[in-house]
């Protein structure tokens, strides 16, 4: 694929140009770059696509030159949510780059799985079976292959899935609805069974997530407690996904587990960073902001960066702002100051 052309921006709208300048600028505060990214994501995800959609995808991809692993991994996540084939080549390039940060490569693999295009299977299968690759890459590619196969299967068309409160394209769908809905203990058993394929365990994870939303659902606390047990799993990839789900749920019952995870200096950076951002989404819960501030000078860069973003998110939660972006996630995008 050709690299993002920085010189061919003729005809790109002022909104996209302004957001692009922010997201690629290493001198901009990280929190502001994240807000610009989520604004570009809104444009990149438009269905049907608008004249801003491809330029927004290219603007997101242009920021892969950043030094921030945290930002780059979020770029990959956002491209995976676009349902747009124009994002595939950018993500494949990131995944193939052995010099790229592992967390970013993992997110690119997961994003290719979310997009669901079969032309990504070749690279994903090759890396899944490459013993020279880090475990997190092999595991992510394994799940991504299973998701793409599922996405394009006849079995998927026959499945009935419970409607979800969440619009995200997840690494795996929730468990299908059978004659009787699986109980939380049954889902927990699948979630924690390390002998099962990761894709199947992820399906249990997202089924539990959907039983924990909205937070006043009678099953919510029990489902959160079941998910929390997944934070003790031997797989760092699995633990990080549990923390991500907690960030989606914003359930106060997850705060103790997330705090323990963030506080564990022996925990993998990709897990601690996800715990930090999940706590940021719970910023209106008493004590969370003070917990986050304790890690502003953490030895690990990705954790420090996550704390900056998490505190910005916490401030956003406390202020009751409508959208964590420089333009809204719904309605017509507005211009922003450069």
Curated annotation (Swiss-Prot):
Disulfide bonds: none annotated. Binds 2 Fe(2+) ions per subunit. It is an enzyme of class 1 (oxidoreductase). This is Deoxyhypusine hydroxylase. HEAT-like PBS-type repeats lie at residues 71-97, 104-130, 200-233, 238-264, 271-298. Fe cation 2 binds at residues 240-241, 273-274. It is found in: Cytoplasm; Nucleus. Fe cation 1 binds at residues 73-74, 106-107. GO terms for molecular function: deoxyhypusine monooxygenase activity; metal ion binding. Its EC number is 1.14.99.29. Pfam families: HEAT_2. Pathway: Protein modification; eIF5A hypusination. One of its GO terms (cellular component) is nucleus. Its cofactor is Fe(2+).
